[in-house]
Amino acid sequence: MSHDTTPPLPATGAWREGDPPGDRRWVELSEPLPLETGGELPGVRLAYETWGSLNEDRSNAVLVLHALTGDSHVVGPEGPGHPSPGWWEGIIGPGLALDTDRYFVVAPNVLGGCQGSTGPSSTAPDGRPWGSRFPRITIRDTVRAEFALLREFGIHSWAAVLGGSMGGMRALEWAATYPERVRRLLLLASPAASSAQQIAWAAPQLHAIRSDPYWHGGDYYDRPGPGPVTGMGIARRIAHITYRGATEFDERFGRNPQDGEDPMAGGRFAVESYLDHHAVKLARRFDAGSYVVLTQAMNTHDVGRGRGGVAQALRRVTARTMVAGVSSDFLYPLAQQQELADGIPGADEVRVIESASGHDGFLTEINQVSVLIKELLAQ
């Protein structure tokens, strides 16, 4: 008789106070953070990780910004405090694209995230989890919080800021909000403003989480029950379909059944098992509250808001800029990267990452992305 020894899913996969710090360090904002929608957020702190060393004149710092479900653990093994290995292995290290013999690399966990930075799962000043009380934030708010990293290290400007997807949104906001602080800019698979289709894809994901009976309006952290892992699992399945390419799905899975299962008898296709796997995997390292907060921030991303529109906002960017998209990305199609390259003064022509992996190509095509990073840093 077989017994399932798989541990149950946690109500949240967030890093919580008392967990091992791993390779994280923290920077605390000295004042409450003013928010774009009004009001302010007190007690903000950001978790971050670093690789390499600052040079004498502090001119070699590179900022790496993660996507929606990423965190500060860009490279490195899974272990205490880090529920998953690095999400961009092969990019940072001696002799690699971000050569730690030359550059000091900094990667924060985004404001609103769940791996050490202030977010819905973290402790508010009153000692309780923020939960539903966590305010609506924007991509611009996250960047204003990250400015504290410059002060923390005594850096005047970043040698480069780079990011993909939500990380690219943040990188663009860095260059538009603080143009004198960003010398080089790499934007991967990201837009100047979120499109109607991107917002539409996000809508059922948010509904899935909020419809989970264990969501409790966002206040589930210290309540009995499994937490909204079912709703977040549905959201992850929907999102993952948009992250990958149709050709990859056909070539990798086709119409094959999952091993030992028969779809004609109620079993799963292999591609369904793949989506189930990613839903469970995310639940062990991420948080539904952060999923909602950060998805809302991505929905409202618009670099032109309050700046006279996108075209005028892009003209604010003074960094040496490279823009790249993925050939098979239907979530953030190449036309959006073309808009960035056309609008940013001095930007190179759009670079195309050839991949069947869809939007996730900026994460999976390490060799191609490494070439782009090296080229940008050589300029």
From Swiss-Prot:
EC number(s) per entry: 2.3.1.31
Subunit structure: Homodimer.
Region (Disordered): 1-24
The protein's name: Homoserine O-acetyltransferase
Classification via InterPro entries: AB_hydrolase_1, AB_hydrolase_fold, HAT_MetX-like
Keyword Acyltransferase: yes
One GO biological process term: methionine biosynthetic process
The organism of origin for this protein: Thermobifida fusca (strain YX)
Keywords for this protein: Acyltransferase, Amino-acid biosynthesis, Cytoplasm, Methionine biosynthesis, Transferase
Residues annotated as binding substrate: 236, 360
Pfam family of the protein (one): Abhydrolase_1
Purpose: Transfers an acetyl group from acetyl-CoA to L-homoserine, forming acetyl-L-homoserine.
Location in the cell: Cytoplasm
Reactions accelerated catalytically: L-homoserine + acetyl-CoA = O-acetyl-L-homoserine + CoA
GO MF assignments: homoserine O-acetyltransferase activity
Functional pathway: Amino-acid biosynthesis; L-methionine biosynthesis via de novo pathway; O-acetyl-L-homoserine from L-homoserine: step 1/1
Domain AB hydrolase-1: 60-365
Chief localisation class: cytoplasm
UniProt similarity note: Belongs to the AB hydrolase superfamily. MetX family.
Lineage, top ranks: Bacteria, Bacillati, Actinomycetota, Actinomycetes, Streptosporangiales
Domain of life: Bacteria
Broad enzyme group: transferase
GO cellular component terms attached to this protein's record: cytoplasm
Active site, UniProt feature: 165, 329, 359
